[in-house]
Amino acid sequence: MIPGEIRPKKGVIEINVGRATKKVLVANTGDRPIQVGSHFHFIEVNRFLEFNREDAIGMHLNIPSGTAVRFEPGEEKEVELVEFGGKQHVFGLNKLTEGSTHHKDEILDKAIEGGFKGAEEK
């Protein structure tokens, strides 16, 4: 082996096997691109992304760790979400969750109060 050499294993790596998934249609209603990382609690993404936020509670993008999805202004695209593992204790950067994802009504109420598009669809 050469120092620094990477020798990936052959074959396909499966991620998030056995976890519940959902597809959601997301529209960027803002005037700037928005990028969302792989493990960001999806209900807490930028308030200018419009989608059914209730469907995103306890979910993150079903993409490889360390990657992201970019939404251009005016763009609409379907993404797949996957549930978080473990005890579903999530602390989002917009303080909608702050702990358990099992308090859906409280999380949605905070999203509505904060002007997050798509939260009012509950």
Curated annotation (Swiss-Prot):
Q: Keywords assigned by UniProt?
A: Cytoplasm, Hydrolase
Cytoplasm recorded as keyword: yes
A GO BP entry is: urea catabolic process
Q: Which InterPro entries does the entry mention?
A: Urease_beta-like (IPR002019), Urease_betasu_sf (IPR036461), Urease_subunit (IPR050069)
CDD domains according to UniProt: Urease_beta
- Give the location in the cell: Cytoplasm
Q: Where would you find the membrane-spanning parts of this chain?
A: none
Reaction catalysis annotation: urea + 2 H2O + H(+) = hydrogencarbonate + 2 NH4(+)
Region forming the signal peptide: none
Molecular-function annotations in GO = urease activity
How does this polypeptide assemble, per the annotation?
Answer: Heterotrimer of UreA (gamma), UreB (beta) and UreC (alpha) subunits. Three heterotrimers associate to form the active enzyme.
The name this protein carries in UniProt is Urease subunit beta
